[in-house]
């Protein structure tokens, strides 16, 4: 009986977390649609960072490690912008990352290693 209840709670958590991640990614999509370039994106960073931060925390807890890793990289870069850094090309990178995370929510076999490596290489100076 306890096992069944635990499973139900776990299933319910996963269902709710999945719904929340979809919502957070959709919020990001809407914000990104209102941007045209790095400067526009920089002006919306505080809003979008909240969504990535939530995704970064929720995704690994529900078995979406890849999404969590990508959200973490993006969250770190956005925090640098919020600290006053100018990051060339960040708008396109974030847009690509958000799309890939949405794709991952539909198909867990989507490959992210290429984008992760590109981010780590292109923006190496911003990572500790």
Language model: regions and residue ranges:
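Non-catalytic helical tethers at domain boundaries
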Residues: 1-128
